Amino acid sequence: MIELGRRGVFWFTDTLDKTQLIDLVQRCEQLRYSALWYPEVLSYECFSLGSFLLAHSEKLIIASGIANIYARDPTAMRQGQHTLGKLSGGRFLLGLGVSHSLLVEDMRGHQYRRPLATMRAYLEGMVKAAAAFPALSEPSPIVLAALGPQMTALGGERTAGVHPYNVTPEHTASARAIIGRDKWLCVEQKVLLVAEPSKAREIARQAMAFYLPLPNYRNNWKRLGFTDEDLDNGGSNRFLDAMVAWGTETAVNQRIQAHFDAGASHVCIQPLHPEGQPIPDYNALTALAP
């Protein structure tokens, strides 16, 4: 059974080569973070990368944040989850998500369907696969990438919890109210140890550029009270400050604690580099370690 601690790390692993990946996973383990989360976007395939990270660590939980359900059918997903979980001694946590139409239709050539119905059917397919093949029936936890209330509710009903990304402590409180007290609420939070406002916001704007055009995120940000003016032209200061916890170590820790106070069971920090480079800030990881 996976024991997920309070602090983990998230990183966009597509930016790292072999040596950098090994360095990242081993430093996370040395600093006693509970888990390392990674996405499936442009380069590395989810289970291949998960296997590599597990092979270069001993105790760290390796978590997909998230595996794209359009990349494989439910049986293949269950097989991948089972394989990495069994061969790692239970250190693999599968996060699932519907991804985004840009990454599904333009990149993969699939039709992007209604997210909630598609995810519900996919989870049912994984259950059927486990029932059909006894080797796949061992219980293994799943968390759902969830932004809106309906997907969050589905995660609370059908999985071990949810993994919100690009959210605020207010969203965390809402998600906790939906899923109940006993489910995992694994929140991603970008952090930046830069105290000068203009520099911090420049780096934050760079970090958010990929996400700002995506409808799933924009819809959720509007539910949180942001306007089109906040989200256009690279993001307003108010929006950037809400997405990236920047400033001193004390200020950043206060934001992380705000998520815990709102009901998060686990916060995975994404340590943006103070010079905007596409590599983790290991000084931040050290300063913010559990």
Spans of model-derived segments:
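Active-site-adjacent structural elements that line small-molecule/cofactor binding pockets in enzymes
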Residues: 1-290
